[in-house]
Amino acid sequence: MIEALLVATGGFFGAITRFAISNWFKKRNKTSFPIATFLINITGAFLLGYIIGSGVTTGWQLLLGTGFMGAFTTFSTFKLESVQLLNRKNFSTFLLYLSATYIVGILFAFLGMQLGGI
């Protein structure tokens, strides 16, 4: 039962944090590139890598990794924004967003794991 509570607590704070960051960027970003989701997902990849790489206890992994990072990052919004770029025929931004998210996300997850293991 405590495990579910840790995940739920982390998830609550992760979702609220993502909501606040997304709204902040949407008010300031006037480009077609979905910068808020991109930065959230890249930051989340790095932090999750760091959490796992640092060897924290299972409780902290559940709270921060599964809960907070699971709600903070958003694969579904990434896919929705990608489809919206395609529907608007904004092919160059679509390709940039898609490739940058995957490539930079993997690199940042690796970097986080390396730094977490120091």
Curated annotation (Swiss-Prot):
Subcellular location, record wording: Cell membrane
Catalytic reactions of this protein: fluoride(in) = fluoride(out)
GO cellular component, one term: plasma membrane
Any Pfam family: CRCB
GO process annotations (BP): cellular detoxification of fluoride
UniProt keyword Metal-binding, yes or no: yes
Topology of the protein relative to the lipid bilayer: Multi-pass membrane protein
Transmembrane segments: 1-21, 33-53, 55-75, 93-113
Record keywords, A-Z: Cell membrane, Ion channel, Ion transport, Membrane, Metal-binding, Sodium, Transmembrane, Transmembrane helix, Transport
Molecular-function GO terms, alphabetical: fluoride channel activity; metal ion binding
Binding residue positions for Na(+): 70, 73
Activity regulation info: Na(+) is not transported, but it plays an essential structural role and its presence is essential for fluoride channel function.
Record-stated family: Belongs to the fluoride channel Fluc/FEX (TC 1.A.43) family.
Annotated NCBIfam families: crcB (TIGR00494), PRK14205.1 (NF010801)
HAMAP family in UniProt: FluC
Function recorded in the entry: Fluoride-specific ion channel. Important for reducing fluoride concentration in the cell, thus reducing its toxicity.
Protein name, per record: Fluoride-specific ion channel FluC 2
Organism encoding this protein: Bacillus cereus (strain ZK / E33L)
